[in-house]
Amino acid sequence: EYLPIDTVYPTFNNGYSKVAKSGGWYYVLTDGDVSEYSDEDGGLAYEGDVYFDFDVENIFGDEDGNLYALGNSGPLVRWGTEEDEVLLNYCVMVSLHPSGKKAVGWSYSNSITEYDFETGTNKERVIDPVEGINSVSVTKDYQAVCGYKESETLLNIYDNNWNEVMTISSTDTESGMLEGVSAFEQTQNGWVIFDSWMENVIFVGFDGAILKEVSYEELFGTLNWPYVNGTCMDEEGNVIVAITDQREDNSCYETIIFKLKGF
């Protein structure tokens, strides 16, 4: 389902737009700026901008209605608290748990850092199956690490205690290709995997069965060089997707938002 935005967000940076849902509000990040939207008549109505004293690289929402913003190499702050509470001063990349109580940080080696904001502790962990990490996603019950070993891309899925659940490689997919997992979400029926290098969405059951692969063009009606790099879950269990797609006149890219329902 396409969610029209009543403001247009042209951008020359493909693949950097993000979306978060928190406290009944939508937040959209484009080119370092964050805007707030309400849900109105099946679309998004602009309510105002959210200001930070740094360029924002990513945004997250938690189950308690808080909004978080991550700067370039830090900081990670909780917005709306006094002076925007700083949770991490320095971090290259971070994925926040939906509770807001913990997060996973990583760079491009094969090690990650687990952050526990309740205890103020952190722990290093090596992801042995890969030589380097491309992305990490944290959902309610799972953590997904997309990395590479030699020339092969691997998606390793773990539970909250870092017990390995399964590994997906290119040989497991219908297309025979798995290149760059840019987003990963957990629904009531399984996992939704966005491979923006191949422009595919892969639906996987909790039993590990790959149920369906659908192209971005087929699912979203995208045009040229579409890239999904921002997703979140709403309160009803739908996947909210921020995608950048090239305009028909090739003048620039534009941030568009979809709601993925039914899985």
Residue ranges and their predicted role:
Residues 39-42, 79-82, 116-120, 159-163, ...:
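Short loop/turn segments that connect beta-strands within beta-propeller blades
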Residues 13-21, 54-63, 89-99, 130-139, ...:
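Repeated scaffold domains used in trafficking and secretory/extracellular systems
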Residues 33-37, 74-77, 110-114, 151-156, ...:
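Structural motif
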Residues 2-10, 43-52, 82-88, 121-128, ...:
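A short beta-strand motif characteristic of beta-propeller blades
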Residues 23, 32, 42-44, 65, ...:
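Structural signal for glycine-centered tight turns and loop->strand junctions in beta-sheet-rich domains
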Residues 20, 27-31, 38, 61, ...:
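Conserved beta-strand positions in repeat-built beta-propeller and related beta-rich domains
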Residues 176-203:
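Loop/turn-rich, solvent-exposed surfaces of beta-rich toroidal or solenoidal domains
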Residues 225-263:
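Blade-level signature of beta-propeller repeat domains, shared across WD40, Kelch, NHL, RCC1
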